[in-house]
Amino acid sequence: MARIAGVDLPKKKRVEYALTYIYGIGLKSSQDILKAVNISFDKRVSDLSEDEVSSIAKKIQESYMVEGDLRKKVTMDIKSLMDLGSYRGLRHRKGLPVRGQTTKNNARTRKGKKKTVGSK
């Protein structure tokens, strides 16, 4: 099993789809990586040689921010928005939708379980 950026890639999948198991790499990025290192998209992970795996890993390391570093950057970006006191930061802090969605009826995913306010 090939291990790139701390992620075990599934053996039976095609390389272009297996690379998407790495956080921060989507289908387009994986295709760009494979083009850069001259590896066929149709190749399976189990058919990759050690040289090919190392060339993919090197390309990812020098060109992309993935896994822990990317997660840390996203978290720090959200934290900085909250520290600045921007509108987006306030919405993050309150656990409400950030991108302008209405909250009158929906937004249950962000708001959590319904809290019923009873009346007498």
Swiss-Prot record:
<dbReference type="GO" id="GO:0003735">
    <property type="term" value="F:structural constituent of ribosome"/>
</dbReference>
<feature type="region of interest" description="Disordered">
    <location>
        <begin position="92"/>
        <end position="120"/>
    </location>
</feature>
<dbReference type="GO" id="GO:0015935">
    <property type="term" value="C:small ribosomal subunit"/>
</dbReference>
<feature type="compositionally biased region" description="Basic residues">
    <location>
        <begin position="107"/>
        <end position="120"/>
    </location>
</feature>
<dbReference type="InterPro" id="IPR019980">
    <property type="entry name" value="Ribosomal_uS13_bac-type"/>
</dbReference>
<dbReference type="GO" id="GO:0005829">
    <property type="term" value="C:cytosol"/>
</dbReference>
<comment type="function">
    <text>Located at the top of the head of the 30S subunit, it contacts several helices of the 16S rRNA. In the 70S ribosome it contacts the 23S rRNA (bridge B1a) and protein L5 of the 50S subunit (bridge B1b), connecting the 2 subunits; these bridges are implicated in subunit movement. Contacts the tRNAs in the A and P-sites.</text>
</comment>
<protein>
    <recommendedName>
        <fullName>Small ribosomal subunit protein uS13</fullName>
    </recommendedName>
</protein>
<keyword id="KW-0820">tRNA-binding</keyword>
<comment type="similarity">
    <text>Belongs to the universal ribosomal protein uS13 family.</text>
</comment>
<keyword id="KW-0699">rRNA-binding</keyword>
<dbReference type="InterPro" id="IPR001892">
    <property type="entry name" value="Ribosomal_uS13"/>
</dbReference>
<dbReference type="InterPro" id="IPR018269">
    <property type="entry name" value="Ribosomal_uS13_CS"/>
</dbReference>
<dbReference type="GO" id="GO:0006412">
    <property type="term" value="P:translation"/>
</dbReference>
<dbReference type="Pfam" id="PF00416">
    <property type="entry name" value="Ribosomal_S13"/>
</dbReference>
<dbReference type="GO" id="GO:0019843">
    <property type="term" value="F:rRNA binding"/>
</dbReference>
<dbReference type="GO" id="GO:0000049">
    <property type="term" value="F:tRNA binding"/>
</dbReference>
<keyword id="KW-0689">Ribosomal protein</keyword>
<comment type="subunit">
    <text>Part of the 30S ribosomal subunit. Forms a loose heterodimer with protein S19. Forms two bridges to the 50S subunit in the 70S ribosome.</text>
</comment>
<keyword id="KW-0694">RNA-binding</keyword>
<dbReference type="InterPro" id="IPR027437">
    <property type="entry name" value="Rbsml_uS13_C"/>
</dbReference>
<dbReference type="InterPro" id="IPR010979">
    <property type="entry name" value="Ribosomal_uS13-like_H2TH"/>
</dbReference>
<keyword id="KW-0687">Ribonucleoprotein</keyword>
